[in-house]
Amino acid sequence: MMILAWCIAWVLDFIIGDPQHWPHPVRWIGRLITFVQRIVRRYCPGDKALRIGGGVMWVVVVGATWGVAWGVLALAQRIHPWFGWSVEVWMIFTTLAGRSLARAAQEVERPLRENDLAESRIKLSWIVGRDTSQLQPAQINRAVVETVAENTVDGIIAPLFFLFLGGAPLAMAYKAVNTLDSMVGYKHEKYRAIGMVSARMDDVANYLPARLSWLLLGIAAGLCRLSGWRALRIGWRDRYNHSSPNCAWSEACVAGALGIQLGGPNNYFGERVDKPWIGDAQRDISVDDISRTIRLMWVASTLALALFIAARCGLSGLA
């Protein structure tokens, strides 16, 4: 039944994703972060106090998320096993973000194909932190491909990894870790101190999933009739061409699969950030690379699901 719950949750994400007006735990986690952050800022003046307060905030948010998820699941199981199973499916479903990621990328791709640069810049600004107001088509394509490649780890592979390790409650706790990083894990002045622990713990949580994504995306590239060997080679070569210890693993693999370059200079919060280039520019990036990257994401996520199911079945057999 556990394996069936994983599969149904994955299929639900593939088909419907996260409908905009449905209740979603990540929104609740976000409200909790906002509430706790307000308290920390009120009582923790100075950078040192903010770093400590940020660490306490991380423990409170992640611990509360795991505890509530475990408690709700246990209560649902006591009411009725089938009800508990249904709640488990729903929890797992909410930790996966493949369809939402694909939909967001396609929202940028659509006006770009229609040469509506202004609309594609607006839609892109909803999913990236960089300044999109002056981006040209090639830069927009690059930003979308990078976002899909990076979030293949955060949105699918990592939640499945923690689901395998500790069930739905641990997968929910991972979403709290990831949401904390998304909200406060920045290096600019406002968040540098309070978000330090959140940023570093997100790096720790994604350490193994990011490296697994290199292998899965490389295999996916071969299955998608792209260059799997080049994906693995470039992915390994450029795996550290990023300020994050994790992001370049998936981005470099996708760049290698497609034969394009990612990375390079961007503007964040009014500041120019010169990132290393990732991949080799064997051709110019195009709008079609967005749909190719989405396809790589889905194939890699299918492989991840199959891998963790096989591992779980293997462990069950040993037990």
From Swiss-Prot:
Membrane topology, record value: Multi-pass membrane protein
Gene Ontology cellular-component annotations: plasma membrane
Keywords: Cell membrane, Cobalamin biosynthesis, Membrane, Transmembrane, Transmembrane helix
Primary location recorded for the protein, binned into one broad class: membrane
Pathway: Cofactor biosynthesis; adenosylcobalamin biosynthesis
Subcellular location: Cell membrane
KW Chaperone (keyword) present: no
BP terms from Gene Ontology: cobalamin biosynthetic process
One MF annotation (Gene Ontology) recorded for this entry: ABC-type vitamin B12 transporter activity
Membrane spanning residue stretches: 56-76, 82-102, 153-173, 204-224, 296-316
Protein's UniProt keywords contain Transmembrane helix: yes
NCBIfam families: cobal_cbiB
Function: Converts cobyric acid to cobinamide by the addition of aminopropanol on the F carboxylic group. However, the true cosubstrate could be (R)-1-amino-2-propanol O-2-phosphate, leading to cobinamide phosphate.
Family statement drawn from the similarity comment of this UniProt entry: Belongs to the CobD/CbiB family.
Protein name as annotated: Cobalamin biosynthesis protein CbiB
